[in-house]
C-alpha cells in the first residue's frame, strides 16, 4: 500500500506572517532550503539574511540539516510556488505557539491517515477528501486551523455525537471514533515533588507529622496525595491524575500548607525538587530507594515514621 500524504490545513499555501514548522533539507549559498511540514512538504527558502539578527559567523550553529525550525512567512508566490521564510523574525512566544499548533495538527493528521490506512485508501485524493469531511469542517467552524479539529476530536472521546454532523459512512465513523479514542483518551500521569521538613524544637516529630497531615488534607477525591519518607528530613510527595496542570497546582498548594504549618512551630521547610511529571524510570528508582531504606531501618526504633502517609477519604 502506498504511503498516503496530505497537507494539514484546507488552504494549500500559508499566508504572509504565518508562523510555520519546517524541516531543513539543504544549505546553499543563498540560504537554507526547507520543507513546510504542515503543507505536505512543499519547498520554501530561508534567505541567509533572515537566519539571524546578529552577524553570521557559522551557518551550522544557526541551522542544521534535518532539524525542525519555527519560521515566519515573508513572501508567497502561489503561481511559481516560491515561499520565502525568516527565522530571525520569530519571537520565542511565537515559536512556542507554533510548536503547540504543529503538535496538535500532527496528532489529527496521524489519526486521519491511520483511518485511511485501515479503510485501505490507495490515493492521496481519498485522504484529502477525508480531511475535507472531518478536520477541515471543524477548523472552519471554529475559525482556528489546526486547533479546531484537535479540540473537536478531544471532545469526541466523551461525546461522539459531535461527529454526527459530518458526512461519513458508518464504517468511516466507526474507524474514526476507534482511532480518536486510542490516541486522545486521557492518560493518568504521576506528579512528584521532593521536600525537606524538620523541627528541632520541643514538638519535634509531632510538629512534622501535623504539618504533613495538613498537606494530605489538600487531597481531592480525584487527586489523592501520598507522602513517603525517603530519609529524614526528606519526603517525597506524589499524586496521580488525568489533569497535569491541576495535579501540579494541588501539590504546590499542599507544599504551601506544609511550609506554613511547620514554620508556625519554628520548623524548617525546603523544596528539593519542584512538582513535575515523573516517568516509569523515575518511579522505579524511587521504589528501589524506599525498599533499600526500609531494609536499612527495619530494626531501628521509630520505623513507623517511615511508613507511607496517605490521605484517608470517607467511603
Curated annotation (Swiss-Prot):
Keyword vocabulary terms for this entry: Cytoplasm, Initiation factor, Phosphoprotein, Protein biosynthesis, RNA-binding, Translation regulation
Notes on activation and inhibition: Activity is regulated by phosphorylation at Ser-49 and Ser-52, which stabilizes the eIF2/GDP/eIF2B complex and prevents the eIF2B-mediated exchange of GDP for GTP, thereby preventing the formation of the 43S pre-initiation complex (43S PIC). This results in the global attenuation of 5' cap-dependent protein synthesis and concomitant translation of ISR-specific mRNAs that contain a short upstream open reading frame (uORF) in their 5' UTR.
Gene3D superfamilies the record matches: EIF_2_alpha (3.30.70.1130), Nucleic acid-binding proteins (2.40.50.140), Translation initiation factor 2, subunit 1, domain 2 (1.10.150.190)
Ranges of compositional bias, category Acidic residues: 299-308
Modified residues (Phosphoserine): 49, 52
GO terms for MF: ribosome binding; RNA binding; translation initiation factor activity
SMART domains, per the entry: S1
Ranges where the record places region Disordered: 292-315
GO biological process: cellular response to amino acid starvation; cellular response to UV; negative regulation of translational initiation in response to stress; PERK-mediated unfolded protein response; response to endoplasmic reticulum stress; translational initiation
SUPFAM superfamilies the UniProt entry points to: eIF-2-alpha, C-terminal domain, eIF2alpha middle domain-like, Nucleic acid-binding proteins
Protein's cellular compartments: Cytoplasm, Stress granule; Cytoplasm, Cytosol
Keyword Transcription annotated: no
Chief subcellular location: cytoplasm
Domain S1 motif span(s) in chain numbering: 17-88
Keyword Cytoplasm part of the UniProt annotation: yes
Main function: Member of the eIF2 complex that functions in the early steps of protein synthesis by forming a ternary complex with GTP and initiator tRNA. This complex binds to a 40S ribosomal subunit, followed by mRNA binding to form a 43S pre-initiation complex. Junction of the 60S ribosomal subunit to form the 80S initiation complex is preceded by hydrolysis of the GTP bound to eIF2 and release of an eIF2-GDP binary complex. In order for eIF2 to recycle and catalyze another round of initiation, the GDP bound to eIF2 must exchange with GTP by way of a reaction catalyzed by eIF2B.
Assembly: Eukaryotic translation initiation factor 2 eIF2 is a heterotrimeric complex composed of an alpha (EIF2S1), a beta (EIF2S2) and a gamma (EIF2S3) chain.
Family classification: Belongs to the eIF-2-alpha family.
Entry protein name: Eukaryotic translation initiation factor 2 subunit 1
Organism encoding this protein: Gallus gallus
Amino acid at each position: 500500500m502506498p504511503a498516503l500524504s496530505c497537507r494539514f490545513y484546507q488552504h494549500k499555501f500559508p499566508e504572509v506572517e504565518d508562523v510555520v514548522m519546517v524541516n531543513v533539507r539543504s544549505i546553499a549559498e543563498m540560504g537554507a532550503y526547507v520543507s513546510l511540514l504542515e503543507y505536505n512538504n512543499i519547498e520554501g527558502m530561508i534567505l541567509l539574511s533572515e537566519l539571524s539578527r546578529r552577524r553570521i559567523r557559522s551557518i551550522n550553529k544557526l541551522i542544521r540539516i534535518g532539524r525542525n525550525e519555527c519560521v515566519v512567512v515573508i513572501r508567497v508566490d502561489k503561481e511559481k510556488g516560491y515561499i520565502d521564510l525568516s527565522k530571525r523574525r520569530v519571537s520565542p512566544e511565537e515559536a512556542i505557539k507554533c510548536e503547540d499548533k504543529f503538535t496538535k495538527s500532527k496528532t489529527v493528521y496521524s489519526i486521519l491517515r491511520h483511518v485511511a490506512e485501515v479503510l485501505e485508501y490507495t490515493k492521496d485524493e481519498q485522504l484529502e477528501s477525508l480531511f475535507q469531511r472531518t478536520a477541515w469542517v471543524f477548523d472552519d467552524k471554529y475559525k482556528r486551523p489546526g486547533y479546531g479539529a484537535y479540540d473537536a476530536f478531544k471532545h469526541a472521546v466523551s461525546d461522539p455525537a459531535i461527529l454526527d454532523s459530518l458526512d461519513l459512512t458508518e464504517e468511516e465513523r466507526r474507524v474514526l471514533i476507534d482511532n480518536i479514542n486510542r490516541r486522545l483518551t486521557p492518560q493518568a500521569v504521576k506528579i512528584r515533588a521532593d521536600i525537606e521538613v524538620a523541627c528541632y524544637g520541643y514538638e519535634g516529630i509531632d510538629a512534622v507529622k501535623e504539618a504533613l497531615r495538613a498537606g494530605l488534607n489538600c487531597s481531592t477525591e480525584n487527586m489523592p496525595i501520598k507522602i513517603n519518607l525517603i530519609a529524614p528530613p526528606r519526603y517525597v510527595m506524589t499524586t496521580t491524575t488525568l489533569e497535569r496542570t491541576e495535579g501540579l497546582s494541588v501539590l504546590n498548594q499542599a507544599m504551601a500548607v506544609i511550609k506554613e504549618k511547620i514554620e508556625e512551630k519554628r520548623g524548617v521547610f525546603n523544596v528539593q525538587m519542584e512538582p513535575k511529571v515523573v516517568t516509569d524510570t523515575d518511579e522505579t528508582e524511587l521504589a528501589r530507594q524506599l525498599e533499600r531504606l526500609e531494609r536499612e531501618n527495619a530494626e531501628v526504633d521509630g520505623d513507623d515514621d517511615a511508613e507511607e502517609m496517605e490521605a484517608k477519604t470517607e467511603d
